[in-house]
A protein has these predicted regions:
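Interfacial loop-to-transmembrane junctions
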Residues: 259-282
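Acidic, glycine-rich loop-and-beta core segments that form the ion-binding/anion-interacting portion
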Residues: 253
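Juxtamembrane boundary at the C-terminal end of a transmembrane helix
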Residues: 291-299
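C-terminal-most transmembrane helix of multi-pass membrane proteins
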Residues: 285-286
Length: 299
């Protein structure tokens, strides 16, 4: 998500001459629509590939999430590098890539990998005198924040066999994507009251409510299929809570970007920024959905 507006250069004579013959770009509905179309097209391509992997099965899902986690972790380390943090990037990215693959097996593998990561980083710290504790913290946070958290998508896909498992995992991810889209549309058109202007100036309470409604809509569809032991009240609760945690994930990434002084985590996806920008709500939203479905006896 983009948070920091670009500062405009002063109108020097040379700049005035260079821009004198350039027609002004119309603002308002036209520019909003163009931006929305670009954002939507890129988002649709990303979503189609993602959904295809979820439908094809657990192995394609794990591979896709593994690649996604590696890219997210790389972008995270690139941002923290701007803040002077010198993480062990190879170790961190490797761990981020392996976490979703570990989720293919027993959950004990995830615990074992988490232990191995802590041990490896600890040994690196002991034998690298110039390494600071802040470097260690960032090295640990990168793969846990990305790969470990996103592994919930793989666990969701594997929790229910067959078509129902694909439907559930697609539904959970779709609830966060639709929440993001509804929040963007509502906030762009009628958003007046800012949520956290110092962290994410574009987010509004109106968009926040719109996002919740979008998420609830998808969870109602999941309930209506009757594929799962999901009651109507619990489906509504899941829709609200998952959307809220998705927003919190978005704000956490916005705080990281604001702290290091960047607008986007990368430029991989037009209209969205980097892979981390596109996945920030999934990081906290999917694991929240998994926990709620387990607590509610759905999984």
């Amino acid at each position: 998500m983009s948070d920091r507006p670009k500062a405009s250069a002063p109108k020097t004579p040379a700049r005035k001459a260079a821009t004198a013959g350039t027609p002004a770009v119309k603002s308002g509905t036209g520019s909003w629509l163009a931006g929305f179309i670009t954002r939507a097209a890129a988002g649709i391509v990303y979503a189609v590939v993602f959904i295809l992997c979820l439908v094809l099965g657990i192995v394609p899902t794990a591979i896709f999430v593994s690649v996604m986690s590696g890219l997210c972790c790389y972008e995270f380390f690139r941002m923290t590098r701007l803040d002077g943090k010198m993480a062990n990037e190879r170790m961190g990215i490797a761990a981020a890539v392996l976490f979703p693959l570990s989720a293919l097996g027993d959950s004990m593998l995830l615990n074992a990998q988490l232990f191995a990561l802590m041990l490896a980083v600890g040994i690196w710290y002991v034998w690298s005198p110039r390494t600071r504790i802040s470097d260690v913290a960032v090295t640990l946070m990168g793969p846990i924040y990305t790969g470990f958290m996103l592994s919930a998508i793989v666990l969701l896909r594997d929790a229910v066999p067959g078509f129902a498992g694909a439907l559930l995992s697609v539904g959970v991810c779709a609830s966060l994507w639709v929440s993001d889209s509804f929040a963007y549309i509502v906030g762009s058109r009628i958003g007046k009251h800012k949520m956290v202007p110092k962290i994410s100036p574009k987010k509004s309470w109106e968009g926040f409510v719109g996002g919740i409604l979008g998420s609830v809509l998808i969870w109602l569809i999941l309930w209506a299929t009757h594929f799962f032991k999901l009651s109507l009240p619990y489906a509504l609760l899941c829709g609200v809570v998952v959307s809220i945690l998705g927003v919190i994930g978005d704000l956490i990434e916005s705080r990281i970007k604001r702290g290091v002084g960047v607008k986007d985590s990368g430029n991989l996806i037009p209209g969205h920024g980097g892979m981390l920008d596109r996945s920030d709500s999934l990081i906290f939203g999917c694991i929240t959905a998994q926990l709620m479905l387990m607590i509610g006896g759905v999984l």
